[in-house]
Design a protein with these regions (language model features):
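Active-site neighborhood of HAD-like aspartate-dependent phosphohydrolases
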Residues: 264-286
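A feature for loop-to-transmembrane-helix boundaries and adjacent hydrophobic helices
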Residues: 1-263
């Protein structure tokens, strides 16, 4: 067994190698899972609900992220078909994973008759935490970097970051680090500040994720030099714009009623026994 044989490999057992990329992605996913599981227990959900969700969700998310990357790099992969499955070498586009995961989540929670918006609130902030870990996988693979910078740019950075960002004979801007930090700040903001002071209705934390990550990725993508392109445009920036728009509309309540798949009559009794038809009030509030 060889631990840390090089910057890309975490551990090797003979010909079997486990990449840092995989370890960091799974570490992020595990942290997100544990946080979600703790909250779901507080909400009274059976723990097996999340257990049944997370494994297929992780698989589908990675599959969607890889498919998105391969589609927009088809000029290369059409001649290297055997490399399509080589995700340990990098090449996962988060937007593809988000789209695939969103579709699966709609199906899963509707089938289980669980509020999608409530799960949206629960899961999406933790996705930012998982993404913060995942960007360090890009660091180990020397990808998701920006333009050429001078050596003095790294004066106040740790040596291991400076050394790893020396790519193709030049120092590169560590855009992976910028996004990782922004994702971590987004997780903390949504979880501890937004939820406490600005949360109005179910789904708001999920929609805030879309706004936060949309802005973060749009800005940082403009600094990168290895972006996926379509018709001369950066695909990540186009999708990020869509995320921002949908997120803002969601925070305004535009999609709220669409996710109440089956409205049930809701009534409240006042203390004096008066029956109050409060269905509209409850749906507008929660």
């Amino acid at each position: 067994m060889h631990l840390f044989p090089n910057t890309r490999i975490f551990v090797s057992f003979g010909s079997l190698e486990i990449a840092w990329y995989a370890v960091l992605i799974l570490t992020g996913a595990l942290c997100a899972y544990l946080l979600c599981q703790r909250t779901m227990k507080k909400w009274g959900y059976a723990p097996e609900v999340l257990d049944d969700y997370v494994v297929p969700m992780l698989f589908i998310g990675i599959l969607g992220a890889r498919a998105w990357y391969v589609i927009f790099e088809w000029n290369y992969y059409s001649s290297h078909l055997n490399e399509i499955v080589a995700i340990w070498n990098g090449g996962l586009a988060i937007h593809g994973g988000l789209i695939a995961g969103f579709i699966f989540s709609l199906y899963f929670f509707k089938k289980r008759k669980i509020s999608f918006l409530r799960m949206f609130d629960l899961i999406m902030p933790t996705v930012l935490l998982a993404q913060a870990f995942g960007r360090w996988g890009n660091f180990m693979n020397q990808e998701a970097y920006g333009g050429i910078v001078s050596e003095s740019f790294y004066t106040h950075y740790p040596a291991f970051i400076k050394n790893q960002m020396f790519i193709d004979g030049a120092y590169r801007m560590p855009t992976f680090l910028f996004e990782s930090v922004c994702n971590l700040l987004g997780f903390l903001f949504i979880t501890f500040i937004f939820r406490k002071y600005w949360y109005k209705r179910r789904g708001d934390c999920g929609f805030m994720y879309m706004v936060w990550y949309g802005i973060t990725r749009f800005v940082i993508e403009g600094l990168r030099t290895d972006s996926l392109m379509v018709l001369g445009l950066r695909t990540a920036q186009l999708v990020s714009l869509a995320l921002m728009v949908v997120g803002c509309l969601g925070l305004m309540g535009v999609f709220h009623k669409a996710f109440h798949w089956k409205k049930k009559p809701v009534v409240l009794f006042d203390l004096d026994g008066t029956l109050i038809d409060s269905q509209q009030l409850v749906f507008e509030t929660f």
